[in-house]
Amino acid sequence: MLFNIPKREPDDVNKIIEKVQETAEFKPVLKVKNGTVLNTLELIKANVEKNLGTYHCLLLDSNEAWLDYCRNVDKNTIVSLDTETSGLTFKDQVEGVAGVCIKSLNQTEAYAPIGHISTITDDYYPNQVSKEAIKQGFDILNKRGSKYIFHNAYYDLVVLKGLLGYFVPVYWDTMVASFLLNENEPHGLKYLYDKYVMKGKAGVHKFAELFDGIPFNYIPPNIGCKYSAHDSKMTEALYLFQKPFLTKGTSECTEYKLEGVCDVFYTEELPLIPVLADMYWRGIHVDLNKVNELIEKYTKLRDKAKKEFDMVISTLREEILFRAKNNGDIEYPVNYNSPAQIKVLIYEILKSGVIFKKEPTGTGKHVLDTVLNEAKYKG
């Protein structure tokens, strides 16, 4: 005999069949803090239905559905994009892509699942969009001159680079714009949407907290769809709110004197996003812990300096208020970040005269040091 395989008796065969037919207890590959994975998924589903039950979006659950959506995007129009991943690390961005959220001005927001995994089988769900079809869809969008808008494009560009092989152009970033328009408030998408678009009527949904312990790519597409697609709708609405403030010539931009902010947004901030994304792609990353440490340090120094500055000029309060009322070129308290107001303070109210002939109306540190007699200018 070529192979000496032992012969099984009928009783042995029957035992094997019985063993196979037994229903084994399901042990999910994921762990959650409380209860089971399946129970947690039911809670997530219930909470999504509670908060967004009447909300309608599209689930693009096939290659053709995704491509049809892309084909129906109007030419040269705004397309809001967002990506969902299994986590926030670079590996999650490249290998753990769950799906792409999309909304064009002329269509309902939609979600295209790509990499959702069943918690039962630990295999990909059927009825998802292939990565090749995603590429084909973006080819269509690019040829139609789509203008891509994001909320935190820095993150999404890296995800899309992993899918497409290139960085898509950024037409607008609502998070960057929000920092420029008001740096002293939270800049999360849901907070900004609720405050500026819905005027506090939407509420900031907290149901995403239920995802704790379950990566988004393990959420069934039909459950995660409403949560994820809604992000692209909020991004579009926030963009439409911000656009007039950062467009020269509009009444909003003129009223709030935002022309200089427009220049910074269009010529510095937006072009910098793909540069930073490319650096991150190549392995260069900003140490956010160090950044936060420096922010805390210099915020304290700034606040201390401002307090001292306000105390010093408090004796000039009446003169400043008189000037503000009659000339309108200064305010009280004085905006120490405004060279124009500092110039008025030094040369018109303090009447210091020309301090440096080369800079007859200068407001640099050497000028301030001389005015305050804190240091001697050398040079």
Where does each model-flagged region fall?
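Substrate-recognition/cap helix-loop segment adjacent to the acidic, metal-dependent catalytic center
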Residues: 89, 160-170
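Short, glycine/acidic-enriched loop or turn micro-motifs at the edges of active sites
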Residues: 85-87, 154-155, 176
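Conserved "right-hand" nucleotidyltransferase catalytic core of DNA-directed polymerases
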Residues: 1-118, 184, 196-197, 203, ...
